[in-house]
Amino acid sequence: MSTQIFASSSQNEKIHKILRPTKKLQPSVWGERFLHYNISEQELRYKQQQVEELKAVVKKEIFGESAYDVSHQLKLINVVERLGLSYHFESEIENELESIYNKSVDQNYILKDENLHDASLRFRLLRQHGFRVSSADIFEKFKDEDGNFKECLVSDTIGLLSLYEASHLSCVGENILDEALDFTTTHLTEFLANKKEHDDPLSKEISQALERPLRKSLERLAARHFISIYANETSHNKVLLQLAKLDFNLLQSIHKKELSEISRWWKESDFVHKFPFARDRIVELYLWILAVYYEPQYYLARNILTKTIALASIADDIYDEYGTIEELELLTEAVERWDINFIDKLNPEYLQTFYKELLNSYEEFEQALSKEETYRVHYAKERFKELLRSSLEVAWWLKEGRVPSFDEYLKISLINCGYHMLIVSSLIGMKGSIVTKEVFEWLSIDRKIVRASVTICRLMDDIAEYKFEQEKNEEPSAVECYMKQYGVSEEEAYDELNKRVVNAWKEINEELLKPTGVASPILVRALNFSKFMDLFYKNGDGYTQVGKVTKHSVAALLIHPIP
């Protein structure tokens, strides 16, 4: 960490020197690559027309035929979802799965000859869509008299992979799925170790799954990966494959156009020069929000949420890296008041600049909404205020050189990670009747699914920074606080925190089972935020230090179309 000295004028105009700690920042790796993207409305409409025509064919071929048996229909649904096409056929998929679920419940539907792959696929798809199916009822028959998974399953590699994916839909206390995860991970790893070449489709699928199972994968990245695998399957459905490629490239064009608009906003706002101490990551931030919702109808929501997280990122760097405690107290008070007339009390100038940008942005959010929707911005403001209050608490810990207890740390840092604010803010621009005042009130209480997503964010971020960063952060982290409170080693702290992350994923799975407290499209935002953490923070801080995973993800979704 280096230091810089700045001259700053206080309110009584007395000049004093401020020692500001600063990290050496990695500049944006993208430059102005995404600033200009030109695609005509005519070209977009043509692509959309092609997709619509193929959608009609697929709907008739796949969802219009009732003669398929359950196994075949589940496999078709799985292919449609993994190709990234499920958002086109939501009602059809839901109806099919509800029919399968009702058979399971009403007719004690147990297929004695159902193999491991089919049983695992049925379980995963039903759980994925919120149906409460019993893991014990489905998987107990694959165990031997000693309660272990049968050894004969080891040779069923496809079945093992399917069970592995299903095990990631487990809820708290489902021991059989914990055992399934251990069993499949061991034998799938051995399968790869015993192969000299990993170029065949199955080996590629297994490698990808072991790195990141479907439940934790960004839908668009997983779709891009699977499209290439599916294309090499001899029995692939040509219409489905063609639709998947066209749809992927159409969405990419839409997203590139949006990113171009967002990049212009970032450049015209001149944030890089106004806040030279802040991370220049607008492309990565757009990718973050693309993980939350990629569907075309969420254009406004993406625009608002990308700007929100960009402002939050600047605020994070102000509180963590740049501001003095006196400046941070002033800024926190100003944001609490949310009154432009307070701006003259802010010094130095960068505080005024940030405050003005913040208030103007939220005013623009209101203007982008209908009159009946403007109430939503109030809830987002309250969460942003809460975020800065927690950031000030953390700044005081740093100033005092204090390492809080783990319990005290979590109380503040779960707010400070920003995910509660972002989950609430993700609803501002969402159209439709499911987003209501009651939903915002529901989210204002400490809900389990929100807390679980926030826990994943906080702990994965802290582990990544503490474990992988050469330059240790001076502010307290979950790792350090846990070591202090419980008197354990660094590795023991990692183990415990990782267990909490695993448990949080199980809580998310449980909260998404029907009936849910609010509509599923609301809750799934928490799931999608968590998926992004697994991508960017599993092996380091992929946001601050843009590396291979980040570059690959941006290239796959926002640069290279599928040929």
From Swiss-Prot:
Pfam families listed in its UniProt record: Terpene_synth (PF01397), Terpene_synth_C (PF03936)
Pathway per the UniProt entry: Secondary metabolite biosynthesis; terpenoid biosynthesis
Tissue specificity field: Expressed in young leaves. Detected in trichomes and cones.
Superkingdom to which the source organism belongs: Eukaryota
Cofactor: Mg(2+)
Top EC category: lyase
Keyword Metal-binding: yes
Keywords recorded for this protein, A-Z: Lyase, Magnesium, Metal-binding
Family as reported in the entry's similarity comment: Belongs to the terpene synthase family. Tpsa subfamily.
Domain comment as written in the entry: The Asp-Asp-Xaa-Xaa-Asp/Glu (DDXXD/E) motif is important for the catalytic activity, presumably through binding to Mg(2+).
PANTHER family: ALPHA-HUMULENE_(-)-(E)-BETA-CARYOPHYLLENE SYNTHASE, OS04G0344100 PROTEIN-RELATED
Name of this protein: Germacrene-A synthase
Organism for this UniProt entry: Humulus lupulus
